[in-house]
Amino acid sequence: YDPISGDYSIRLDANESFLELPIELLEKAQYAMADIAFNRYPDPNATELCESFGAYYGIDPALVTAGNGSDEWLFIITSSFLMRGDKILTVEPDFSMYRFYGFLAEAESVVYQKKEDLTIDVDALIAAVNESGAKVVLFSNPCNPTSLGLCREEVRKLITSVSALVVLDEAYMDFWDQSLLGEVAQYDNLIILRTCSKAFGMAAVRLGFAVANPKLTQTLRAVKSPYNVNSVSQKIGALVMNEQEVLHQALDEIILSRKALQISLKELESKYPDQLYVYDSCTNFVLVRMPRAKEVFEGLLERGIAVRFMGDTLRITAGSAEENAQLLKNLESLLSSSTNP
């Protein structure tokens, strides 16, 4: 995974929230810093933070363990539950870091290839898991980068049909309604990952959570570093998650932005049917297939707009109304220039 570097006026490449935290909330965070004993190590259990997470989602905080973004959990889980030569099954396309962490654990990679329309045949996936003898299954739902998701019933079927540990990355589930967080305690082979980087607008803070039944949670807490989440991140994360009304309003605004962006991109698809295909989305971004994806990507960069280039597709984060308008204006300019040389 190679993040885009450089100074671009419009950043629609990393699926961050386009909304900054309200100034009132930032002022509360500033005052909260006075409560931190900077000469002391942080709470090893991130108790206040996990309680705020539990209150926000309506789950038992005893099932929640905090980490430095989901990336820390991906490393911890793959290095703790896999031994050299064990098999990890991932799906393609999906978040590229999953296979990378499996590689670091010296696990054997097994790949389930999605259908041509980028959806998952859950029965075929179950067969692939069981036939391969995979010890860990790791995938995102909804999926990054496809913007598509598996419904709750299909994920349940997967979990109950395999003996492998299912690691379900729900980084984008705040934008959909098919989470299994409320059921996680029922399963002895499920770990759900959540993040503060997307819907909550706290990408800079780097907070991620692993949610699992009591036995798995005990294991996760045993293998993580004792003081892994610093006191500043704990304090800010708890403070923000306690502001449920603010977060819900922001979430509504992000979803409206994505829907508007998707509608506008679909209009461009109707106008230039040979140049782009727009996928459905249950996330905060839209995936667009384009035969000239690289050329368009570079053209947008030249105009100060960063999106994510992924082979024959572009992944476009929903931005503010102004950012979306600039993207669409420049995108149409690039599309029309090829049809009218």
Model segments located where?
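PLP-dependent aminotransferase-like
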Residues: 80-139
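Conserved PLP-binding catalytic core of the aspartate aminotransferase-like
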Residues: 255, 268-303, 318
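N-terminal "arm"/small-domain region of PLP-dependent enzymes with the aminotransferase-like
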Residues: 1-40, 132-133
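PLP-dependent aminotransferase class I/II
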Residues: 22, 189-268, 278
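PLP-dependent enzyme catalytic core of the Aspartate aminotransferase-like
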Residues: 153, 294, 299-308, 312-341
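Short acidic capping loops at alpha-helix termini that bridge into adjacent secondary structure
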Residues: 60-64, 85-87, 170, 188-189
